[in-house]
Swiss-Prot record:
It is a single-pass membrane protein. The chain crosses the membrane at residues 36-56. Its main location: membrane. This is Small integral membrane protein 44. Signal peptide: none annotated.
Length: 149
């Protein structure tokens, strides 16, 4: 067996000097960055992408509003319906509901009968009532009356 080991070593050995004694492979990355910098850049990219996905429509609306402010609205947007007020605080919402229903009923009457205005004025709105109904205060039942005597 010692002869076989000597033959295997002899195959890899050569009397000439090695060709690539000081060979260094080229770097795989064109930009040398530490790993933590690369991870920080990727994390920042993910955060920006998620933030844009969340508020992208808001940014788009803001850009359209700025363009409308700077250049004026498009000609086809002149007849567009106006937006509602952002807050209805202090408004009687039940009264507004009644007015809307009466206006809608008036449009149906005007469309069907051909009249311009309804024949009778709308009834006055009912007085406001609380939307929560409370029961009468509890009274002593007959069971307690029997127990007291």
């Amino acid at each position: 067996m010692p002869g076989l080991a000597a033959e295997g070593e002899a195959e890899g050995w050569s009397p000439s000097p090695p060709l690539y004694e000081e060979y260094r492979p080229p770097p795989l990355d064109s930009i040398r960055l530490p790993r933590y910098v690369l991870y920080l850049l990727l994390a920042a990219l993910v955060v920006v992408a998620v933030a844009y996905a969340i508020v992208g429509h808001l940014i788009k609306d803001l850009a359209h509003d700025l363009a409308d402010w700077a250049f004026g609205p498009k000609p086809d947007q002149e007849a567009a319906p106006r937006e509602l007020r952002p807050s209805l605080t202090g408004e009687d919402l039940e009264g507004l509901d009644l007015q809307l229903a009466l206006a809608w009923q008036g449009e149906e009457d005007a469309g069907g009968g051909g009249e311009g205005a309804p024949s009778e004025p709308p009834p006055p709105p009912e007085p406001r009532r609380p939307s929560i109904a409370f029961k009468d205060p509890p009274s002593r039942s007959s069971f307690w009356k029997l127990m007291a005597t």
